[in-house]
Amino acid sequence: MHTDTTRENPQASAPQAADSSQDLAATAPGQLRVIKRNGTVVPYTDDKITVAITKAFLAVEGGTAAASSRIHDTVRRLTEQVTATFKRRMPSGGTIHIEEIQDQVELALMRAGEQKVARDYVIYREARAAERKNAGAASDVAQPHPSIRITRADGSLSPLDMGRLNTIISEACEGLAEVDGALIERETLKNLYDGVAEKDVNTALVMTARTLVEREPNYSYVTARLLMDTLRAEALGFLGVAESAPHHEMAELYAKALPAYIEKGAEFELVDAKLKEFDLEKLGKAIDHERDQQFTYLGLQTLYDRYFIHKDGIRFELPQIFFMRVAMGLAIEEKDREARAIEFYNLLSSFDYMSSPPTLFNAGTLRPQLSSCYLTTVPDDLSGIYGAIHDNAMLSKFAGGLGNDWTPVRALGSYIKGTNGKSQGVVPFLKVVNDTAVAVNQGGKRKGAVCAYLETWHLDIEEFLELRKNTGDDRRRTHDMNTANWIPDLFMKRVFDDGSWTLFSPSDVPDLHDLYGKAFEERYEYYEALASYGKLKLHKVVQAKDLWRKMLSMLFETGHPWLTFKDPCNLRSPQQHVGVVHSSNLCTEITLNTNKDEIAVCNLGSINLVNHIVDGKLDTAKLEKTVKTAVRMLDNVIDINYYSVPQAQNSNFKHRPVGLGIMGFQDALYLQHIPYGSDAAIAFADQSMEAISYYAIQASCDLADERGAYQTFQGSLWSQGILPIDSEKKLIEERGAKYIEVDLSETLDWAPLRERVQKGIRNSNIMAIAPTATIANITGVSQSIEPTYQNLYVKSNLSGEFTVINPYLVRDLKARGLWDPVMVNDLKYYDGSVQQIERIPQDLKDLYATAFEVETRWIVEAASRRQKWIDQAQSLNLYIAGASGKKLDVTYRMAWFRGLKTTYYLRALAATSTEKSTINTGKLNAVSAGGNDGLQAAPAAEPKPAPVPQACSIDNPDCEACQ
């Protein structure tokens, strides 16, 4: 809010500004401050929280508890938790009302299982509140409320303009049902004090509104609009367009702001000067300012913190200008670039489709690194190994996610001819890769993220499985990077048939790396025979089931290595004629060929399924239009992209792969009133992906007509009229019907497309379903193909903490007269689950089952139906409640048996770990910290399952490499 201070607060005259050292500390920038009940502001200190918690324990356990080290440790830990909560919420400092601190103390006590102490603390607070109320009649209430003056940037004091404050709140609430502007105003004034900085008034508005989200999801839109007011004042003022602006003036101001933004951006070398060559007047008129209103708070705050272009900390890129900048960057090589820019802008700004974060970060800038994923193969020589690590650093520097194939590197104990010595194996090099990934900062946005792949026959595989363990020699551990097992079908057959399995060094069996299917089986058995005859000394024979059991055990305990399947990735690859898929990528959805001359690159984007459900059905006409434009945008990325290593450019120009995916699958089910765990959900997964596949292949054929087929088209499966659904049959034939069961049904007429694709297609690969962690937040929909994690939780990420509540659940509960404060508290008590809330009907319990309440078989089956239509793969997380070795065994066998190419994270809870957090006993704005980031499993016994990971980058809560 840009505050016009011409009107005084009518409530009272202003007191003199204080000048004590405490007051100076309380108003220092970047500090946490506490507003006391009498309106004075003091510095935030841990000591008073420690005293309050200690008194609460002493009241329950008696005075002798003061000497207990247990009490001291507990109090210290709880104090740290409370302080950490506020620092996460307000990393740049801010003001906290004393009541909010007490709310957090109460919550911390209950989460720690100290129910007796918490109950006593609640009773104490209520008693003190009653005392204040009685005393207030004679003192506090009798005194006039002091007026509030704000401190401007130049240090001058001016009265707070209550009229302006009211106008901004009213505008933020306009058109939204069941939100209370007067409540926001009252609560905001509680968090203001005399002499408050102008920017802190804006912050107080946002912080106040966001605490109300748990009561009513529409407050998320209110909060976003209040933040938008701050952003507009910041950006428009910097651009010299206006000091501030109400929403209804933005249509005119956006048209003025766009050319001013392009001019400033080019001047500061933050955007490409070529953007000045566009018809900016035409583009400015095409901007739809009403689309500013569709952001949730999480979405806009994410963009504000990490995406909008800024100079010296000042954001001067408004949301619609941000989308137009990306659109212009993607249209820069188009013939009719204005028309294409408007087409691309409309797709992005409507949230019908969203490009991946690297594209959003960098399109239209001087360094347009727009690609999400890179895959490399590491050769078996020292210069090649360190060359690959160098490539990792260069690719990661500009926000790419990496998948490295380490299978060619010889195993521990292998002979090295050049030195007449023995190899130390793969693991020491992976330690270097790990440390490089941590060291490389991706444009200041996130640390590097990498996944190392190793085939299951590699002699180092057993040590590879243990890389993420917290015990053992730390020199042979990689705590900060991901690992994945690249599993041939023959190994899975041996597991099913209870056979043995032989481990080799790739230096002795070099051709296995490039073989798959029956050819691999024949050659592998040949090498097994050589080993049995004593002609291959360096090998090891194990029972396949024992190795499988260890793979699952490590996956459960450490979260790694992920299980991915070599043969379906290769047998169904359209590009078998020019190479081999040796690994997947960081997020396990990309399956492209790699070799010493080619680093595979893939550009990602995702269709928002929610926006394509109209009147409870999939709008295929709109979907076709969206897919056509999306594929064009993805294809454009290939030519515009900045390539930091030549092998990446070589690969991308030859094959032109792209990865079109989806997000909002769970929300699309809600709109159709379909439970995730149902045959109807599987049918929707099948039919929606079939339609997207059809339209995407068709769109790529259209581009081939216009621009030509990709260079290596001849000889591909496409050139033979073999579509993804057809390659599924090849997998069945090679693997054997005994080991696979997939649905091959079709609902569309594919014959014309089979014929057409033989004439040419623009892209070697077209579809891949990425995790969409960040862009789903931006658009306000459920992530990718994920089931809902919790119906109410606090999401913590680099932008702070955000209460997330399922708006569809709230809608349905309201319709049945069940939405009230008690229901909010019940949802908190049961960690966002509805299953144990008795008054919720069974049909809603089925519809709003959360991830661990949906049987894993439904997730696998839906993924299997999608996979038959996709030429690449899916980032598929598997959720297992009551996890056991048997459940993991059944789940991952089923994933392979159903023809899946890859799996991603295992999110496992042991039998007793669905532990409730706490109930809101009063007015706490504090709910279970969860979501797809942050759940810590609490199993009954060792071994413990790995914590549910925050994201694919181990030390970063919002991986932006793959969305």
Positions of the model-derived regions?
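Terminal amphipathic helices with adjacent charged low-complexity linkers/tails
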Residues: 114-116, 120-125, 220-258, 487-488, ...
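Conserved catalytic alpha/beta cores of large enzymes that bind or transform nucleotide phosphates
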Residues: 419, 423-431, 438-548, 553, ...
